[in-house]
C-alpha cells in the first residue's frame, strides 16, 4: 500500500474513528507488464481491466472477502453513498455493491462493456469495443489491428487462444 495509508490508519485508530469509517484503497486501472506482448493499460485484456480494490469497514463489511462479481468503476460512488446510508442520484448508472460485500444474494449484472477510442498520443492502440461475461469475452477492433478476439475465460483465463475463427463459437 501507499506510504500514506499507514498514517491514515494510525490517525483513524488514535481518533477512535477506525471502526466507523469506510476506507477504500484502489487503483484507477490494471496494467499489462508484457502479457500479450504489451505494456500499458489500454487493452481489454484481464491484466488491464482488473483493478485492485481493498475496502475496510468493520461495521458494514466482514473482512477477508474476495468479491468475484463483475464490478465497474461506475459502481464505486453508489457504494460509497450506500455505506453512508444515502441513495444514489437518479442519473448515476452504477449500482451499489455493498449488499454483495455483506453476503447478500442480489440480482447483479451478467456482463460488462468496454470501450477505448484511438488517441493521437498512442497511435499503436486501436479503437476497441468489448463485452465480457463471467465466461466469455469479445473484443472488436477498429483501425490498427485487423483481427477481432473471442475468449472462453473459463477454459483460457490468460486469453492465449483466440477463438474468433472457431466455428463452434
Where are each of the predicted segments found?
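A short beta-strand-to-alpha-helix junction
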Residues: 1, 17, 40-51, 61-78, ...
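C-terminal cap/loop subdomain of S1 sulfatases and analogous C-terminal strand-loop tails that border
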Residues: 29-35, 74-77, 82-153
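Long, internal low-complexity/basic segments
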Residues: 1, 81, 124, 155, ...
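Histidine-centered active-site microenvironments of extracellular/periplasmic hydrolases
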Residues: 9-65, 72, 93, 118-123, ...
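Short, compositionally biased segments
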Residues: 1-11
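Secondary-structure boundary motif
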Residues: 14-17, 103, 165
